[in-house]
Structure formats: C-alpha cells, structure tokens
Amino acid sequence: KDTLESIKDIKEIDEIIVVDDGSSDKTSEVAKSVKSDKINVITQSQNRGKGYALNNGLKEAMKKADIIGFLDGDLGNTASEVEKLITPIINNECDVTIAKFPPAKKKGGLGFVKNLAKESVKEMTGVELTSTLSGQRIFKKEVLEIFDEIPFGYGVEVGMTIDILKNNFKIEEVLVNMTHSETGRDLKGFIHRGKQFYHIKKVVRQKKKEWR
C-alpha cells in the first residue's frame, strides 16, 4: 500500500498496473483501497510465479504506454525514487534505466550470485553493470517489443539485460535511495540464492546458444 501511495501522484505516471498473482497477502484488496484513478488491478486465480505475473502486466501496459516500468511491491515509501529512473528516459539519455540500490544494511549472501550475474553479462556483451539483478527498471516501449515474452524464473533480469545490450540499446544504472526486504543469511536466504544461481546459469547457457 505504501508503495502505491508513494507513486500515485507522480505526474509522469499515467497508469499503475498491479498484478495480484493469486497470493495470500490480499494484493487486490490493498490496491483497490488506494484512492487513485491510475490504478488498474489484474487478478490471477493462481500463483504462477514472477515471470508469468510480469508478462500479464506487460501485455496490458503495452496497449497504450510509450514508457513502461517494473517495480516490486515491497519498496514502500521509497518507491517515489522511481522518478530518478524515469527522467533519463524522458530526456532520451538512454533506452533502459536500472535502479542501483545503496549497500544492503544486513549481511546477505556471499556475493556469488551477484558476481555470476555481473560476469555473465560482461562476458557476453562487454558491458559491466553492477545492478544486473535489480528488478526495478524503466524501459522505452521499443525495447520491450524485442521480447515475445519475459523469460520466466529467477534469471529474468540477467537474460533480459543480455538481450537488450545485444540489440544495441543503451542501459544506464541510476543510484536511488530505495529499500526493500533483503534476503538474509538464514536457510531460506541460502535456498533463495541457490535457486537464483541455478536459474542464472540456465538462462546464460540458453543465451550463449541464441547469440552464437
């Protein structure tokens, strides 16, 4: 709710699409309780993962928007920082912006997932980005038109980044003061990172075949 409240009055934003992926946290009800004509809620009957939700929201957004962004729902009040990501696109400085977060407050993983993502993108494109795993991104519509659909799984961001750079679009990382729930060093955190690692490896293997 805080995320929606903090972006609904940003003048550059015409529509906010919320995808309720059949989760148990009452996403639809929360979204509908926010007073704004900009909010459009899409409800899925069952949870089919992040990639599926992104594709659903994207289909809707592509109908009328020139600039499209992805934001996680847990950014809270810091979501208003999205303005910093929108401005370079409007000013035609680049085709895609990626949010670069301040250093994490709590000790997360051992950085191996981040490094794998960073090195994979660099190896395939020659471009070094530090926030390859950040899902907070703004795109010009023509960038998203190169995708039939967004790749599924935790490798989403890495796969997209490789394709975007290979198609000669320009990506700019923008430092933002956003915060969201971080993955800690507990078992759940390690399982999450293990899955990420596996998915990134899989996506990169796939991209190497595609871009031979």
Task: List each language-model region with its residue ranges.
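Residue-level preference for short helical/loop micro-motifs built around acidic side chains
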Residues: 1, 25-29, 52, 131
